[in-house]
Amino acid sequence: VLLIRLAWGVDYPYTKMPIEGIRNLDKMDIDFAREFGYRIKLLGRARMRDGKLEAGVFPTLVNHTYLLARVGGAYNAVRVEGNAVGSLFLHGLGAGSLPTASAVLGDLISIARQNNKLNSGFVKQVLPQADILPPEEACSTYYMRFMVKDDPGVLRDLSGALSDQGVSIAQAIQKGQSEAGVPLVFMTHEAPVSAIRKAVETMRKSDFLLAPAICYRVMG
């Protein structure tokens, strides 16, 4: 929300932002992502599409060649893309005892000095509300994992449910059977959130899906 204010000078209400954590992240997904050439990172992303702001926080498969994919430990990073400057990358400590203590101490000193000057670049006036793109209209390529029964026709039914919503499959992987079923993984071409949700809802009503579908956005 703060970066959106700085980048576009608009207010995006926190309560309206789609947020998904890593509670459902499984080691299986980390391994599959690596096999496709990606690493999973929890990203907050925002971009302007046709004058409307698309934003959210999601676990995301990041191409392993991107600098963002290499950020780990107590480090955080910000990637900015501009029309003229291209891609900019800021990287540094964002957690840990010393960086946190430094930030807190800086705030305390500022308060003690009664420093009421605005920071450089801070927009003083009340910010206008962002024109928000409805979350279901956001588009992305997707990583999708399904735990299914080892029955004939399952792959056909899954791909058919996606095809019915206009979602095409770029890659697919099927691994050996386990007690939890057979993991079937798709990487899709770009598709709207609404199409992915409708396809998953259709699959949920079938008898071959043994666990909730896992869907993560893909970057790169």
Per-region residue spans from a language model:
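Substrate-binding/catalytic subdomain of NAD(P)-dependent oxidoreductase enzymes
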Residues: V1-R70, Y75-A77
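Hydrophobic alpha-helical scaffolding
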Residues: I19-R23, L90, G94-L98, V148, ...
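A conserved regulatory-domain signal marking ACT and ACT-like small-molecule sensing domains
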Residues: L108-G220
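ATP-dependent carboxylate/acyl-activation modules
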Residues: Y66-T141
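Structured core elements
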Residues: K41-L42, G56, R79, F89-H91, ...
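A generic structural signal for short, non-catalytic loop/turn and secondary-structure boundary residues
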Residues: A33-E35, M48-D50, V71-G73, N83, ...
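A generic structural motif
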Residues: R45-R47, E81-N83, M147
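Conserved active-site and cofactor/substrate-binding residues in soluble primary-metabolism enzymes
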Residues: V1, N24-M28, G72-Y75, A95-G106, ...
